[in-house]
Amino acid sequence: MLSADNSLDPLLKRPFSLFRRLDKDIQILYRVVGKLTNILKDKKPDDILEIIGPLGNGFPVIKGKARPILIGGGIGSAPLFSLAETIKHKKPIFFIGAKTKKEILYTYALKSIGINPIISTDDGTLGQKGFVTDMLKVFLTHHSSPITDYCIYACGPRLMLKELTLLSGKFNLKGYIALEENMACGVGACLSCVVNTKNGFKRVCKEGPVFPMEEIKWDAD
């Protein structure tokens, strides 16, 4: 959770995912869409921000031979880069989707760690035209078999994650999704970020934001 120093507008901190961990620093990737991000874009080196975190859990690194498939939708791609760096030795397959070319993020950084992403845009301005889940379906249709094991990691719009969960079920794949929800307190007290799961309501800021994809009750949306 992050806010600009000495600012009461916006009053509440906003949740941001961790883009990259460095030796003594962290990087946050954001899109300028509201009051806080408009303040952030004008910040300079040595300016002060107020941060509470880290909150909740992260993506688990699965042991074994399963090859990771990472799927990011729009700004939801941000938290997947740190994971990609961590598991690059497992040769992850990375799908990135967005509405248009200008919303495709950090492909240069992925290539610098040896990952060439599979890109799709809704309008066809970069990569294949269509939804990122359509690209994944084509890939799995041609590469999935009883002797091939994949593990899904994803973050993005809820509609994308819902479709991804259904698609993964058809191919008998397991995986993890990071949910993007509005938060007020970030410590589990206000319950503004609860989601319905097969094990009852859970707080994204405490029990999440990462959940096994099959745990979320999408029909409750």
Where are these regions (language model features)?
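Short, surface-exposed secondary-structure boundary micro-motifs
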Residues: 5-7, 54, 198
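Short Fe-S-cluster ligation motifs
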Residues: 203-221
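Ferredoxin-reductase
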Residues: 1-45
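FNR/FR-type flavoprotein reductase catalytic core
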Residues: 35-143, 147-180
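Short, Lys/Arg- and Gly-enriched loop/turn segments at beta-strand edges
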Residues: 7-16, 56-63, 205
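Local cysteine-cluster metal-coordination motifs and their immediate loop/turn environment
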Residues: 79, 158-159, 180-209
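A generic structural signal for residues embedded in beta-strands
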Residues: 1-4, 51, 195
